[in-house]
Amino acid sequence: MLQKFNYFGEHENYVIRLCNPNKEQICFLNQSHTHELSLRFNEMSEFHITIPYLIDGEVFPYYDRVLSKKLILIDDIGYFLITEVNETDDGIVKQKTVTAYSLETELAFKKLNLFDGTYKFYDPFNVENTLMGKILSTSNWKIGQIDADLWNLYRTFEIPDSTVYEFLMNDVENSYECVLL
C-alpha cells in the first residue's frame, strides 16, 4: 500500500472508483462526496463515503448502481467491498451512506474447508499440498511473497469452525509466528 503525501505532509486526494464485483470500473466517485478512510496494518481497513443523489443540481447518473457487494477502488490503496448502503431522504437531501471494508473481508464470508491435521505452511513447487494452497484454492486470492523461512515449517491444527479470515489471522499467524498482509 503506497501512500502519497504532499510537501506539507498532507495526504493527497484519492481517486475513487465504483466497480462491479469482477473489478470492471463503472464510474468515478470523487465529485462532491465526503469520505473517510481508516487504514489498518494487518487488519481490515475501513472506508466510508456519502454519495448525494444530486451533484451541482444534476442527478448523479450512477446513484442507483451503488449497491452492497459492489467494489470501490481507491488508487494506490486497493479494493474495498461494499458491505452496507443506507439511503436517507429528508425531503431536501437524498443520499447514500456507504460502508466498505478492504477486500480481504471476502475471506470473512468463506467457511474453512480443512480437516484436523498437520500442514506444511508453503512449498513453491507443490503449492496445492500446503496449508496456504489449500486455504486459498477456494478463493480468488493468490499468494504473493512468502519468506523462505516459513516454507518448510509444519504445524498441527485442530481446525475450528471458523471463517478463512479468522483462521488465517488467529491460528495461522500464532502457530507459524508470522504476519499475513
Task: Give the location of each predicted region.
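Assembly/oligomerization scaffold segments
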Residues: 1-118, 169-176
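Charged- and aromatic-enriched interaction segments used to assemble
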Residues: 101-181
